[in-house]
A protein has these predicted regions:
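Bacterial N-terminal signal peptides that target proteins for export
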Residues: 1-10
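Bacterial N-terminal signal peptides
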Residues: 9-18
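Compositionally biased non-globular segments, especially hydrophobic aliphatic-rich helices
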Residues: 10, 26, 298-299
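Bacterial Sec-dependent signal peptides at the C-terminal "C-region" and cleavage site
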Residues: 19-32
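Single conserved hydrophobic/aromatic residue that forms the stacking wall/gate
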Residues: 291-299
Length: 299
């Protein structure tokens, strides 16, 4: 199993080079990818990055976090003070196209307020746009109550699954959303980086997420942000993720990844991702149902 996993990672590296060579054109999202030297210089100028995936305790999902009625700056301030005391200097935070669609101006004001709270505690977040995980549908307004004992009971995919078939309608809206947010904060030093898509292909989307993944990289590149961009690989064993992973590995400025494996296999992951000669950031790890008894999961 270990050898098979290693082969898959190596394959992604070389397969990705071939994919990029075959798919690039004059409008390629790879045209303005940061060079290895530029991203290494950027990374060398950062502190040792330590943080967590963050949503306030009073919000069940991204919509509730950013909606005007439920945005809880007092709670956020309290929790970020705790994060600062723990030594955290970054957070991974999910945005919401649903809130932006219904209240773009208000949402950006709340994002600005959130960034000011972050700066107060010397925290620079990375923002996530899209997500293929958990509940397939979402709606603006009051969100469901949490289900006791159910992990992520109210978390929602973004965009909703029901919207994805009509790309002629969906993509222009999402492009406007992405470009509005990125252009607003493209040179804002309160933001560490942009994480464009959480676990593309999850929830049985598989390679159907490639189109949106490709487009979001292009839309963000069009805005020429001063911050690096990434999307993290997360499934190393499924052949149906090879094209997605290859694209992310060959278009991200900085390589990010998720790993819920044991310590030895995580070390193997790092070893092979270093072949890409770019800095690495692990944006999800820790608790695993497979290795729940291992003390290293809480390091």
């Amino acid at each position: 199993m270990k050898n098979k996993w290693c082969v898959n990672v190596v394959f992604l590296f070389f397969f990705g080079i071939c994919v990029c060579a075959c798919t690039q054109d004059s409008n390629s999202s790879n045209n303005s990818r940061w060079s290895e030297e530029k991203i290494q210089e950027w990374y060398d100028n950062q502190p040792w990055l330590v943080g967590c995936n963050y949503i306030p305790a009073t919000a069940i999902n991204q919509i509730e976090m950013w909606s005007a009625v439920t945005f809880d700056s007092e709670q956020i301030d309290k929790e970020l003070s705790w994060a600062h005391e723990l030594g955290f200097n970054t957070l991974r935070v999910f945005l919401s196209s649903v809130v932006w669609q219904n209240d773009a101006t208000g949402m950006k004001k709340r994002v600005d307020e959130f960034l000011n709270i972050c700066r107060k505690y010397s925290i620079r977040p990375m923002f996530v746009f899209f997500d293929d995980c958990w509940n397939p549908e979402s709606a603006y307004g009051k969100q469901p109550e949490p289900k006791p004992g159910v992990h992520n009971s109210g978390w929602v995919q973004d965009p909703s699954c029901s919207l994805r078939k009509d790309t002629l309608t969906l993509y222009p809206f999402l492009q406007e959303y992405i470009k509005d947010i990125v252009r607003t904060y493209a040179h804002d030093d309160r933001i560490l980086m942009w994480d464009l898509y959480n676990e593309p292909g999850n929830s049985k989307h598989e390679e159907t997420s490639l189109s949106l993944l490709t487009n979001v990289f292009r839309w963000v590149r069009d805005c020429k942000p001063s911050q690096p961009i990434t999307a993290g690989i997360w499934d190393y064993n499924s052949s149906r993720k090879n094209v997605l992973n290859a694209f992310m590995l060959n278009h991200s400025d900085i390589i990010s990844y998720h790993n819920y494996d044991n310590e030895a296999r995580h070390a193997e992951c790092i070893k092979f991702l270093k072949m890409l000669n770019r800095p690495l950031i692990c944006t999800e790890y820790m608790l695993s149902l497979i290795h729940i008894s291992e003390p290293t999961r809480l390091r």
